[in-house]
């Protein structure tokens, strides 16, 4: 049961958030009338069907290719599936994606892992963007049409990163006919949300189009005290400058005000589970974590004819956040029940990022066969700065984790904020790729990238100039439905550790080998795949054995190596016109092949060896197929985390979700989602004995009314 007591500031924020909801409530209510009026004048009513449960086409490789034509594992989660499962944030989308492990509150943000490595490559409409940073707010999915996830290394188009995955968020774009989508939802723990999505032509010819999206949310959590109020606005316009040229530009803004939960729960000092209630909140009631994120963007695309196109895209981001918290820190002694004390701090984070990507692509005829070429380049410039303030008076309060009152500690002041200085990161690269038709059933994919990378931080500078990243793949069509493929992909990651000569180590290199089979069944409506993969990451930093550390001063050599390997199976799309399915299974093991401390040990023990995820939905034949039922299963094996001399463990678990929806008429649909039906108690992530161990969500429900015109 959630505690109703809140701080005055928290009550004020919730009242303000509810006030902000009224404009969108009115928009949802008024849109049917506006739609009917416009339909009577010029346009018929249009039903927005979304982008499917698993669209067949992915754009993260610049070329609009089917999943079958990409020689790596790809998952596409479309708008229809996000609506069915009520996936309203990127965290929720990733929790249901094949092979992804989600770990909340890792360095103040949510971390995603694929194949044992942290995902650090993110794109928006194919342009590399800043995410996974303390200043960048969590992503609201109201803006996006679909999410594309390419697993493995992707250094060819993205540059520096880990051999984990690339996540491409594809924005909603204006349509040539009027369309409206409005949603009102209410759920467990006082979660309320309103969305409105309106777009269409802005002149008679349709050569000027626009689309606006707004969303407000006011929510609590399954743990006490914490809440969050968020507001989002997205606007985009498109202009046909000519029959082959389109200019688009837009703005995206998100504001979040939250009472956060930094502490999570601790463990016993021997690593055992204390068994605290899932509603436990071990922070101070005055905690807050706030974000303001603004992104402006523009694209210019031109078709030259005969299949050749050129596109240039630019993004500019400003992201600011501030955090003030106090939370329980310290492992608990089994005998005394003591060990935690209140610790806290105050921080401000400022970020800017400018990014640009430009490319040309098109077909060529060589030796009597048609091939495709892609030539381009991209660049990013990021600045970031962290300010730290000391709480005054400093907190050193014992915490009884079995009977803690979050309101018992008065809010302290904050001393002057200080910063060591600004960190600047620049990366540029040029890339080329060709898809060469060697024979009717055989396509060879070859590519390469040259990257220039440099970073200046307080007291340190680093430059990589240049770094070559190769790529290769082979696709063999067995028949019209099935293909075999193999690929070789590489990526590099700079390191900041210094050798005894005072020079930074060479970059870590990640190499991804993959082979598999893909099928596009039922005329491409159902995609299936089976893949095996082998990843090696070399040149990892190791302490120099010939130069022992003196205090905190250590020297390093590039001697570390890890390996990750496994296989994946996935099926997604339409089994029949009324039955959709999205299922994925991943088996993955990882190991330190060469490490001065952990040699021979598992590399990423916190990622399960086995992950199975399923979502399916079926429109029943009765009642003109107005009633549909759906369900999902998430199964995974156990995982562990090493914390000093002890190991924390979470056993395997299974979660079951259910959904029922009823189409009231051709415009209105009501749905009910029930998640974690059997109320399974589990830890979503384990960090250590002292704090930041996170329960997964208990059983919860969400009721949604959706209007589409």
Task: Report the location of each language-model feature.
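Surface-exposed extracellular loop regions of Gram-negative outer-membrane beta-barrel proteins
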Residues: 257-268, 383-385, 474-519, 524-557, ...
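Membrane-embedded beta-barrel scaffold of Gram-negative outer-membrane proteins
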Residues: 301-305, 309-315, 319-327, 484, ...
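Structural signature of Gram-negative outer-membrane beta-barrels, strongest in the C-terminal barrel
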Residues: 238-240, 351, 370-374, 378-382, ...
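Short acidic/polar hinge/loop motifs at secondary-structure boundaries
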Residues: 102, 111, 127-151, 169-171
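Outer-membrane beta-barrel translocator/receptor signature
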Residues: 142-145, 156-235, 241-245, 294, ...
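Acidic/polar loop-and-plug regions of large Gram-negative outer-membrane beta-barrel proteins
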Residues: 217-221, 234-303, 316-351, 395-423, ...
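C-terminal beta-signal and adjacent terminal beta-strands/loops
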Residues: 634-642, 661-709
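Gram-negative outer-membrane beta-barrel transporters
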Residues: 441, 557-643, 678, 708
């Amino acid at each position: 049961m959630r505690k109703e007591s809140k701080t005055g500031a928290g009550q004020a924020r919730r009242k303000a958030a509810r006030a902000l909801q009224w404009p969108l409530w009115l928009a949802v209510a008024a849109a049917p009338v506006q739609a009917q009026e416009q339909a009577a004048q010029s346009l018929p009513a249009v039903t927005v069907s979304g982008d499917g449960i698993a669209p067949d086409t992915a754009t993260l490789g610049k070329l609009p290719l089917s999943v079958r034509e990409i020689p790596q594992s790809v998952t596409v989660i479309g708008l229809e599936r996000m609506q069915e499962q009520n996936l309203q944030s990127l965290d929720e989308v990733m929790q249901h994606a094949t092979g992804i492990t989600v770990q909340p509150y890792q360095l103040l943000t949510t971390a995603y892992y694929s194949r044992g490595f942290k995902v650090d490559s993110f794109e928006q409409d194919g342009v590399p963007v800043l995410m996974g940073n303390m200043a960048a707010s969590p992503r609201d999915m109201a803006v996006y049409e679909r999410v594309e996830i390419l697993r493995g290394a992707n250094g060819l188009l993205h540059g520096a990163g880990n051999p984990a995955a690339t996540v491409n968020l594809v924005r909603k774009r204006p349509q040539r006919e009027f369309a409206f989508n409005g949603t009102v939802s209410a759920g467990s723990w006082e979660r309320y949300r309103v969305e409105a999505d309106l777009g269409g032509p802005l002149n008679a010819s349709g050569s000027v189009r626009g689309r606006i999206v707004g969303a407000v949310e006011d929510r609590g959590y399954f743990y006490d005290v914490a809440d969050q109020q968020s507001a989002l606005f997205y606007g985009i316009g498109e202009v046909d400058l000519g029959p082959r040229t389109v200019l688009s530009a837009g703005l995206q803004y998100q504001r979040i005000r939250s009472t956060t939960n930094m502490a999570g729960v601790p463990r016993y000092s021997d690593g055992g589970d204390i068994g605290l209630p899932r509603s436990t909140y071990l922070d101070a009631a005055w905690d807050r974590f706030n974000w303001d994120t603004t992104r402006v963007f523009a694209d210019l695309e031109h078709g030259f004819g005969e299949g050749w196109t050129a596109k240039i895209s630019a993004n500019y981001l400003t992201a600011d956040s501030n955090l003030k918290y106090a939370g329980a820190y310290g492992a608990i002694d089994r005998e005394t029940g003591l060990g935690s004390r209140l610790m806290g701090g105050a921080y401000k984070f400022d970020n800017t990022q400018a990014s640009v990507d430009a490319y040309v692509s098109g077909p060529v005829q060589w030796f009597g066969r048609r091939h495709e070429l892609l030539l381009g380049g991209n660049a990013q410039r990021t600045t970031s700065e962290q300010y730290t303030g000391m709480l005054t008076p400093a907190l050193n309060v014992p915490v009884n984790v079995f009977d803690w009152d979050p309101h018992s500690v008065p809010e302290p002041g904050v001393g002057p904020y200080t910063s060591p200085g600004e960190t600047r990161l620049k990366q540029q690269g040029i890339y080329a790729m060709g898809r060469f038709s060697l024979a009717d059933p055989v396509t060879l994919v070859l590519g390469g990238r040259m990257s220039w990378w440099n970073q200046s931080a307080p007291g340190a500078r680093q430059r990589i100039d240049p770094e070559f990243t190769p790529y290769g793949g082979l696709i063999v069509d067995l028949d019209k439905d099935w293909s075999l493929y193999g690929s070789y992909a590489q990526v590099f990651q700079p390191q900041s550790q210094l050798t005894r000569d005072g020079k930074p180590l060479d970059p870590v290199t990640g190499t991804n080998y993959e082979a598999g089979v893909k099928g596009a069944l039922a005329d491409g409506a159902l995609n299936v795949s089976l893949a095996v993969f082998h990843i090696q990451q070399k040149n990892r930093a190791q302490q120099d054995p010939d130069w022992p550390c003196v205090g905190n001063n250590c020297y390093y050599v590039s001697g570390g190596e890890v390996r990750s390997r496994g296989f994946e199976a996935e099926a997604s799309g339409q089994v029949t016109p009324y039955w959709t399915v999205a299922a994925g299974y991943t088996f993955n093991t990882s190991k330190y092949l060469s490490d001065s401390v952990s040699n021979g040990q598992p590399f990423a023990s916190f990622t399960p060896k086995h992950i199975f995820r399923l979502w399916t939905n079926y429109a029943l034949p009765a009642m003109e197929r107005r009633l549909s039922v759906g369900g999902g299963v998430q199964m995974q094996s156990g995982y562990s985390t090493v914390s000093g001399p002890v190991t924390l463990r979470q056993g395997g678990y299974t979660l079951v979700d259910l959904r029922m929806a009823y189409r009231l008429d051709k415009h209105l649909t009501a749905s009910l989602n029930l998640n974690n039906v059997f109320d399974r108690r589990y830890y979503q992530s384990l960090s250590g004995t002292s704090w930041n161990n996170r329960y997964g969500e208990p059983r919860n429900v969400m009721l949604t009314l959706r209007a589409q015109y």
